[in-house]
UniProtKB/Swiss-Prot annotation:
Matches recorded under CDD domains: hydroxyacylglutathione_hydrolase_MBL-fold
Family annotation (SMART domains): Lactamase_B (SM00849)
Role: Thiolesterase that catalyzes the hydrolysis of S-D-lactoyl-glutathione to form glutathione and D-lactic acid.
Source organism: Histophilus somni (strain 2336)
Cofactor binding mode and count: Binds 2 Zn(2+) ions per subunit.
GO biological process annotation, one example: methylglyoxal catabolic process to D-lactate via S-lactoyl-glutathione
Record lineage: Bacteria, Pseudomonadati, Pseudomonadota, Gammaproteobacteria, Pasteurellales
Cofactor(s) it depends on: Zn(2+)
Keywords: Hydrolase, Metal-binding, Zinc
Binding site for Zn(2+) 2: D56, H57, D125, H163
Protein name stated in the entry: Hydroxyacylglutathione hydrolase
InterPro entries on file: Clx_II_MBL (IPR035680), Glyoxalase_II_hydrolase (IPR050110), HAGH_C (IPR032282), Hydroxyacylglutathione_Hdrlase (IPR017782), Metallo-B-lactamas (IPR001279), RibonucZ/Hydroxyglut_hydro (IPR036866)
EC number, UniProt record: 3.1.2.6
Length: 233
C-alpha cells in the first residue's frame, strides 16, 4: 500500500505498508488527516521518517508524539531539537522487517535525507516530478551531487516527492527545450489528473529521466543556470 495523504496547500504525507507489517510514515506537516486515515484503516505506525527541518515537513511533530508516543521518529541532525528520537545521516535502518536505505541528499537543506524502501524513493524536497527543490543552502554542488545520486537508482524506482508541484514544473520544463514531446504529453496527462483532484504522484525514475530537465543537465554549471532560471520562473 502506497498512499499520498494531502496536507496543507500542496504537501503529501506518504504512507507505505507491506502486507502484514506496520506502516511507515514520511514527514508530518499536520496530524488530522494522518490520524483519521490510520484510525479508519486500523493501522499501526512502525516509524516516522523525517526528510528535513522545514515547518511544512515537521510542523505537527509535537502533536504526532502526543498521538503516537511509542513510535520512533528518525531524521537528520538538523531536526534533533524538533523532537526526532533517532538522529541518522546515512546507512540502513531495519524497522519491522523493512530495510530502509538512508540517502544523504543535501542542498535544499544541508542535512536533507531521502529514504529508499522496497524500491520506493521518498525524496522530500530534493527531487520533484519534472523539477527539484530550491537550493536554500546556496550549495549548488551539494544539490547537484544529491540529484546525481538519485538519478543513479534503478529506472523502475517509484519516486514519491513531498509536494504537488508537477504542473508548474512541467510548464518550466517546456521552456528549456529538452525532450518537449515527452514533457507536453505528461503535461496533458497531469492536467487531467489534477482537474479530477487526483495526485500526479508517484512518478518513476524512468519517466523523470525523460521529463525532468534537472536530471538531464550535463554538469554543475548547467545545473546552476537552470536552477536559477527556475527560481525566476
Amino acid at each position: 500500500m502506497l498512499i499520498p495523504i494531502p496536507a496543507l496547500n500542496d504537501n503529501y504525507i506518504w504512507v507505505y505498508k507491506r502486507e502484514n507489517l506496520s506502516v511507515i510514515v514520511i514527514d508530518i506537516p499536520e496530524i488530522a488527516a494522518l490520524s483519521q486515515f490510520i484510525q479508519a484503516q486500523n493501522l499501526v505506525i512502525g516509524a516516522l521518517l523525517i526528510t528535513h527541518n522545514h515547518r511544512d515537513h515537521i510542523g505537527a511533530l509535537a502533536e504526532f508524539k502526543q498521538f503516537y508516543p511509542h513510535v520512533h521518529i528518525y531524521g537528520p541532525a538538523e531536526c534533533a531539537d524538533q523532537g526526532v528520537t533517532q538522529v541518522i545521516d546515512a546507512g540502513r535502518l531495519i524497522i519491522d522487517e523493512y530495510h530502509i536505505d538512508v540517502l544523504p541528499t543535501g542542498g535544499h537543506t544541508a542535512q536533507h535525507l531521502s529514504f529508499l524502501v522496497d524500491g520506493h524513493l521518498f525524496c522530500g524536497d530534493t527531487l520533484f516530478s519534472a523539477g527539484c527543490g530550491r537550493v536554500f543552502t546556496g550549495d549548488y554542488s551539494q544539490m547537484f551531487t544529491s540529484l546525481q545520486l538519485l538519478k543513479s537508482l534503478p529506472d523502475e524506482t517509484i519516486v514519491c516527492p513531498a509536494h504537488e508541484y508537477t504542473l508548474g514544473n512541467l510548464a518550466f520544463a517546456l521552456t528549456t527545450g529538452k525532450n518537449k514531446s515527452a514533457v507536453q504529453k505528461q503535461l496533458e496527462k497531469v492536467k487531467k489528473l489534477r482537474a479530477e483532484n487526483n495526485p500526479s504522484l508517484p512518478t518513476t525514475l524512468a519517466l523523470e529521466k525523460q521529463i525532468n530537465p534537472f536530471l538531464q543537465v550535463e554538469g554543475l554549471e548547467e545545473f546552476i543556470e537552470l536552477r536559477k532560471a527556475k527560481d525566476m520562473f
